[in-house]
């Protein structure tokens, strides 16, 4: 039995070798220039879902009530300071005779 000489390259001739190498180089360029197909961006954030407008409105109303009460308290303290905090301790009550 005679052995068939094996080629060191799998190509039978140079034209086939060039075609294989060109195809391989084209494949490598495509792999190198490939763009990802998976969308890795975070989802859009909708402001009307993140901001609770009803809650903000309720908080604003609560703060306006607090501001009004603070203003009234300030007026009372200012009037007390103006009169030096004096109170009328006199009792002008006259007893009735029965």
From Swiss-Prot:
InterPro entries: CFAP97D1/2, Hmw/CFAP97. Expressed in a number of tissues including brain, thymus, lung, heart, liver, spleen, kidney and testis. Pfam families: Hmw_CFAP97 (PF13879). Belongs to the CFAP97 family. PANTHER family: CFAP97 DOMAIN CONTAINING 2, MIP11318P. This is Uncharacterized protein CFAP97D2. It comes from Mus musculus.
